């Protein structure tokens, strides 16, 4: 392995966090390929090919040739979330080119949820749950003393490519315009000054007349923006995971109303939902934040850093390639090289903060075991006494019923006497005589 190299098939790898987040720790020396891939001869010292480019003919053709020879392992990197329109409604994307199937030996997925979807496309045994190394340094504390109590800062963001044709762009523009119109009518919301922070792409900011007149490359880093806001609205994008990872209440902004591979606790799919959703983002219910956190752990492997898993996966693939070439056999791989993250996801079952989920229920506010034991003992004692008390009350009720029966009989007798007297004097009785008891016991 000492003489082998890892070849990255991406011209801009040295400036992309998809690669720079782990390249310096690579178990093999890294070489970035900037040649035209269909004409690129695979070097003899290639220990592994790594790329996230899996869309165009150039990459797919080069990957297929190497994959068919089955001597040099290919690792495909997932660079973010799956987006429904990008998969199925992208007019410039060749049908089936998005991992249907994967043209490689393994795909480094960002989470279990993504792995399940891609495996359903005919990729059994190819998906490894790695995570996103570039997010390893994101703080998950959710605490920021710099945030103001009288100001609500809401980030409105779009994906780098929010639309794939003119019709989709029109819908995206409609959605962000609806947010702007709503904010203009609500400068103060829920007793707090509303401040929108815009992070739009595809020329939407100047078209709306929002944001700063700054070139995209000169913008404040997204990580710093996320650290300064209270909540996030975003079109389908990996921004969602970056936001949720920071424990920010986060909603999808999707007027396309497309299926979502990642479920969100909040979604705005029409303008009449803005007020109610933003109201909850400003004061998020605990149960929705718990659901948001649950989805995060399913969609992003983040219980432990992703970089060590990626490096382990690279080493495992390189070893398998070496063994195949030494023995003149095809590369053979287990269905899972990495098992830790999936096992961790299955084992996770941390207790919930029941008091936070039900803030209005004072019963759950008491977490003193001794006090709870005393109250439970008293409750058990009280329950033991109840059958005797109920028996006494039943006796008293039976006595009252007998007294009521006697009173009813006296009233009936008096009524019949009055009727008889009226008849005797020729006066038509107001009511006929009562025959028997008008009321009967339930028994």
Where are these regions (language model features)?
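Conserved catalytic-core segment of nucleotide-activated headgroup transferases in glycan assembly
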Residues: 19, 135-207
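Catalytic binding pocket for nucleotide-activated donors in carbohydrate/polymer assembly enzymes
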Residues: 238-302
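Donor nucleotide-activated moiety binding/catalytic core segment of transferases
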Residues: 198-246
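Structural loop-to-beta junction motif characteristic of Rossmann-like glycosyltransferase folds
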Residues: 72, 231, 247-251
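Helical coiled-coil/dimerization "stalks"
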Residues: 388-443
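Short loop/helix-cap segments at secondary-structure boundaries that form the rim of catalytic
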Residues: 19-20, 41-43, 117-121, 205-212, ...
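C-terminal amphipathic helix plus adjacent low-complexity
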Residues: 283-391, 395-405, 409
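Active-site and donor-binding regions of nucleotide-sugar-utilizing enzymes
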Residues: 7-138
């Amino acid at each position: 392995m000492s003489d082998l190299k890892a070849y990255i098939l991406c011209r801009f790898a040295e400036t992309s966090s998809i690669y720079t987040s782990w390249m310096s720790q690579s178990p093999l020396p890294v070489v970035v390929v900037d040649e035209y891939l269909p004409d690129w001869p695979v070097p003899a010292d290639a220990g592994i090919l790594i790329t996230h480019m899996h869309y165009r003919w150039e990459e797919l053709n080069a990957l297929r040739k190497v994959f068919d020879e089955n001597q040099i392992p290919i690792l495909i990197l997932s660079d973010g979330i799956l987006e429904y329109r990008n998969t199925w409604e992208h007019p410039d994307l060749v049908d089936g080119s998005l991992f249907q199937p994967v043209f490689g030996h393994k795909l480094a997925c960002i989470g279990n949820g993504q792995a399940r979807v891609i495996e359903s496309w005919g990729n059994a045994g190819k998906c490894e749950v790695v995570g996103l190394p570039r997010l390893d340094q994101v703080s998950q504390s959710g605490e920021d003393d710099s945030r103001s109590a009288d100001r609500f800062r809401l980030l409105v963001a779009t994906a780098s490519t929010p639309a794939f044709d003119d019709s989709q762009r029109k819908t995206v523009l409609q959605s962000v315009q609806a947010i702007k119109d709503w904010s203009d009518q609500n400068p103060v919301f829920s007793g707090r000054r509303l401040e929108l922070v815009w992070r739009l792409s595809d020329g939407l900011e100047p078209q709306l007349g929002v944001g700063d007149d700054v070139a995209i490359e000169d913008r404040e880093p997204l990580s710093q923006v996320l650290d300064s806001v209270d909540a996030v609205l975003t079109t389908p994008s990996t921004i969602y995971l970056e936001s949720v990872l920071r424990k920010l209440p986060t909603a999808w902004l999707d007027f396309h109303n497309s299926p979502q591979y990642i479920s969100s606790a909040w979604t705005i799919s029409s303008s009449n939902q803005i007020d109610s959703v933003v109201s909850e983002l400003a004061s998020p219910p605990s149960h929705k934040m718990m659901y948001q956190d649950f989805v995060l752990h399913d969609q992003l492997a983040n219980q432990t850093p992703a970089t060590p898993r990626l490096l382990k996966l690279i080493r495992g693939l390189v070893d398998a390639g070496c063994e195949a070439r030494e023995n003149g056999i095809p590369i053979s791989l287990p269905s899972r090289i990495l098992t830790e993250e999936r096992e961790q996801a299955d084992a996770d079952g941390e207790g919930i903060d029941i008091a936070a989920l039900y803030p209005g229920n004072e019963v759950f506010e008491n977490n003193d075991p001794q006090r709870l034991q005393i109250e439970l003992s008293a409750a058990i004692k009280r329950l033991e006494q109840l059958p005797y008390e109920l028996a006494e009350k039943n006796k008293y009720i039976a006595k009252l019923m007998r007294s009521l029966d006697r009173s009813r009989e006296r009233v009936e007798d008096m009524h019949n006497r009055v009727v008889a007297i009226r008849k005797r004097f020729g006066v038509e009785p107001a009511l006929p005589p009562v025959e028997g008891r008008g009321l009967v016991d339930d028994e």
